[in-house]
Swiss-Prot record:
Its cofactor is Mg(2+). This is Polyribonucleotide nucleotidyltransferase. The gene is pnp. SMART domains: KH (SM00322), S1 (SM00316). InterPro entries: ExoRNase_PH_dom1, ExoRNase_PH_dom2, ExoRNase_PH_dom2_sf, KH_dom, KH_dom_type_1, KH_dom_type_1_sf, NA-bd_OB-fold, PNPase. One of its GO terms (biological process) is mRNA catabolic process.
Length: 702
């Protein structure tokens, strides 16, 4: 039986059909918002997965190009692996939901969001977060706290819920807020240097609308929700926990109080060896339980240290940033490099400039077709001193790369100001917390070193949180390192300039953040950001005046758009010849702007521009031109006076004396002065060598 429920969000209808599709799924809903439709299916394994120490939740976000009436590009005409955007949207769905599952739940859970129809005014990723929450709540899977999501824009000083395409074009803020009815679960934002107060108010504005959507979900669950399955939650054996803590608590505590990370880890390894020696025979089949007890003990000690002793593992104050190091220009042949170090976290970012034709072509459901600025993030195993195979980028690498990219996007100059494609690659050399925000800092250094005229330098910082079990007490921590991230409750990343915020991403391991915590984190991040920006400016205060000698050079010329066809030629014949003859790259825009780029061959750029100017220049009647003879006939000579533009010098116009044979006066390849005497109604050009000579003689006499 099909059940339909409706509500209104931002003046548009949100509709849910339950029982319409996916009859064999634990829960399946067909959800629409305007003409955007997403199908969400939620399922869980019947038994917990053995031998793991994490919750195996997987979220998939599947874009179908038929949803926007497109056929996939390329040779294979079907969707392949998920796009980067699909991966980012899947991560955005995962983050607010994961903390709300019961601790110790080890059953595999999969949520599949399939985008079936897209109206660009209504973002499918926002609908998918709401639908994933509702599907879980309606299912028998032990998930009981609804989560809602909205997008918030800022146009002309007014906040807008779920802005349309036209509004998104004018917004200076792109914010996603996810929340339960009581607390904020997740925030993602990109902005054009938004001040902290405005950002905080925008988050609260979105939070209020989330409460209405949560109420709608609660109504749906009350009517249609299944009875929840009996939970089988993993918990370490009580006897094992008691015995291991009795034996090792003091040793673990002593190790955890060592400030140096390497020394601390070395001491912990020794403690683990002692625990193994003590209990390997007594609890030979309880290895997972022993491992869990060690983890819980470490977590208890670190959290108590932070919350009750006002002490951080490395001895810093709660608002103190680790020592900062900045260096530029360390790679001699690249276009720009930045090496950023914060404590034991170190990132090297390399900037590469290319022609506008080097943009990344996108084949997705969004209207955006290409990307001129991109940032890629690599996290090799050696950055944490581990050994593992090096594969392609995973979801984490893609997510961190996009986060750092978003932080700098509002600061990148337009293609008119800086006619280059820009690629940044951040190599994580050492990781001890917040490498994504170190990538923002490294990217700023690399851009400045490359001579990219960014509006202002940007920096990023990660804020952390420790709360009491009842959530009544909380402490915000500046510049969290790995141990504080691992055992803490929040990773609140903020990037921006001295003027304001350009990106935010935060998620939490607890059941949401209070409003005051969000405000404190924003204020603490600003203080830390300004400190880091000061260090960056000490290293390189402004973009270099000159590009690297190894970087390409681009020149811009403007022509009449009606003349574009003359530059391209039939089947691209003309432009391809220019490219082949001058060894340049040429990008033509519809408005008549032409970008000519060459790698270390400035003469090629000049030659190409000269040819293009000739192709688009109008032949003026009465003007004298220096042309080249291209062909002779018995009635005259054809002369090219501009690239691709020929005229005829009749035999009677070649000389003052009578000419019997054209070749007696000119030959193919000769350069001669000619005057344009006439252009007929078919565009044919008549020339005269005789009149050109006469005019030059007349000018000499004057």
């Amino acid at each position: 039986m099909i059940h339909t429920l409706e509500t209104t969000v931002a003046g548009r209808k949100m509709k849910v059909d339950f029982g319409k599709t996916g009859m064999l799924s634990n829960a399946a809903i067909f959800m629409s918002y305007g003409d955007t439709v997403v199908m969400i299916n939620a399922n869980a394994s019947k038994e917990p997965r053995e031998g793991i120490d994490f919750f195996p939740l997987s979220v998939d976000y599947e874009e179908r190009l038929y949803s926007v009436g497109k056929i996939p590009g390329g040779f294979i005409k079907r969707e392949g692996k998920p796009s980067d955007k699909s991966i980012l949207h899947a991560r955005s769905i995962d983050r607010p939901l994961r903390p709300l599952f019961p601790n110790g739940y080890r059953n595999d859970v999969q949520i599949v969001n399939t985008v079936l129809s897209v109206e660009q005014d209504n973002l499918p990723e926002i609908l998918a977060i709401n639908g994933s929450s509702l599907a879980l709540c309606l299912s028998s899977i032990p998930f009981t706290t609804p989560v809602a999501a909205v997008s918030v824009g800022l146009v002309d000083g007014e906040f807008i819920i779920n802005p349309t395409v036209a509004q998104r074009e004018n917004t200076i803020l792109d914010l996603t807020v996810c929340a339960t009815k009581e607390r904020i679960m997740m925030v993602e934002a990109g902005g054009q240097e938004i001040d902290e107060e405005t950002m905080y108010n925008a988050i609260l504005f979105g939070f209020e609308e989330c409460k209405n959507i949560v109420a709608f979900q609660e109504e749906a669950v009350a009517k249609l929700g299944k009875t929840k399955d009996e939970q089988v939650l993993y918990k370490a054996d009580e006897e094992v926990e008691k015995e291991v803590k009795r034996f090792a608590f003091d040793m673990i505590k002593e190790a955890m109080y060592i400030m140096d990370k390497d020394e601390r880890n070395a001491q912990l390894d020794k403690v683990k060896e002692k625990i193994s020696e003590e209990f390997s025979q007594k609890y030979e089949d309880k290895g997972a339980d022993i491992k869990e007890v060690i983890y819980k003990t470490q977590k208890e000690i670190v959290r108590n240290m932070l919350l009750n002793e006002d002490r951080r593992p490395d001895g810093r104050a709660f608002d103190e940033v680790r020592p900062i190091g900045c260096e530029v220009g360390i790679l001699p042949r690249t276009h720009g490099t930045g090496l950023f170090t914060r404590g034991l976290t170190q990132v090297m970012t390399v900037a590469t400039l290319g022609a506008l034709g080097d943009v990344q072509i996108l084949d997705g459901i969004a209207e955006e077709e290409s990307k001129r600025y991109m940032h890629h993030y690599n996290f090799p195993s050696y950055s944490v001193g581990e050994v593992r195979p090096l594969r392609g980028p995973g979801r984490r690498e893609i997510g961190h790369g996009a986060l750092a990219e978003r932080a700098l996007e509002p600061l990148i100059p337009s293609q008119e100001e800086f006619p280059y494609t820009i690629r940044l690659v951040s190599e994580v050399l050492s990781s001890n917390g917040s490498t994504s925000q170190a990538s923002v800092c490294g990217s700023t250094l690399a851009l400045l070193d490359a001579g990219v005229p960014i509006k202002r330098p940007a920096a990023g910082i990660a804020m952390g949180l420790i709360t009491s079990d009842d959530l009544e007490r909380e402490k915000v921590i500046t510049d969290i390192q790995g141990i504080e991230d691992f055992f803490g409750d929040m990773d609140f990343k903020v990037a921006g300039t001295e003027k304001g915020i350009t990106s935010i991403q935060f998620d939490t391991k607890i059941k949401g953040l209070s409003n005051s915590c969000v405000k404190d984190a924003l204020e603490g991040a600003k203080k830390a950001r300004l400190h880091i920006l000061g260090k960056i400016k000490e290293c390189i205060p402004e973009p270099r005046k000159e590009l690297s000698k190894y970087a390409p050079r681009t020149e811009i010329i403007c022509i009449d758009p009606e003349k574009i066809r003359d530059v391209i030629g039939a089947g691209g014949k003309v432009i391809n010849k220019i490219i082949a003859d001058t060894n340049v790259k040429i990008e033509i825009k519809e408005d008549g702007k032409i970008f000519v780029t060459s790698n270390n061959e400035p003469e090629g750029v000049k030659k190409a521009i000269s040819i293009i100017e000739g192709l688009t220049k109008e032949v003026v009647q009465g003007e004298i031109y220096l042309g080249k003879v291209t062909k002779t006939t018995n009635f005259g000579a054809f002369v090219e006076i501009l690239p691709g533009k020929e005229g005829l010098v009749h035999i009677s116009k070649l000389d003052f004396a009578r000419v019997e044979k054209v070749e007696d006066v000119v030959s193919v390849g000769d350069e001669i002065l000619v005057k344009v005497t006439d252009i007929d109604n078919q565009g044919r050009i008549n020339l005269s060598r005789k009149d050109a000579i006469a005019k030059k003689e007349e000018e000499k006499d004057k």
